[in-house]
């Protein structure tokens, strides 16, 4: 999401709704700390060209449902110039963003 906001200029809601990927090369937190080098899950909404490019680079790509990456976020961004808060609610999980 950070890259979508900073590098691509998406607002917080657009960034949280964007197609997501999840790599498995880094060891997991729970015991026995499994790692799956070069394995990556991608949501089906990701461009087929990107999926092909990942495969061509040797990744083992698993395409999951259109909203299949199940880690949800409710991000908040604060504009340092105005002090205005911007939030997003992730459709992958039951979430809502409220402010007052």
Named regions from a protein language model:
Residues 1-69:
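Proteins synthesized as precursors that undergo proteolytic processing into mature forms
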Residues 48-100:
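In a subset of proteins, long, contiguous C-terminal domains/tails are tracked
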